Amino acid sequence: MSGGDSPAPRVLLGVSGGIAAYKAAEVVRLLVDRGASVRVLMTPAAQRFITPLTLSVLSKSPVVADLWDPASGAVDHIELARWGEVLAVAPATADVLAKMARGIGDEALSTYALAHRRAIVVAPAMNTWMWAHPATQENVRILRGR
């Protein structure tokens, strides 16, 4: 990822609450191994599948898991928006896709997504019926149009 004297890419990884959340550990490890600086944001549901501690150890940074708990490593979402060069949401549940498409910021990940002004990469992860639902497809169309 980083070559020569160029600074390490700054990646914000948003982890939402589906069974695929456990794969976030491998994503963080791969990014760090390739020279990226990684910060992780988690939804409350994601924390039911993988702990913030796991992702904090792998990313070597505090995980933002709760906007309102200073002990969770929360920082100003505007500060994070300035820091992150790319927001990668993996996995992106139907819930998080809907929040991002409709401008709902009710937890750390969705609030940050509203403040982020750079590249966003989304890796949807849900069952096929949820993916095929017209509401989900409309949310994907909205996000692609931005």
Each predicted region: which residue ranges?
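A cross-family phosphate/adenosyl-ligand binding-site feature
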Residues: M1-R146
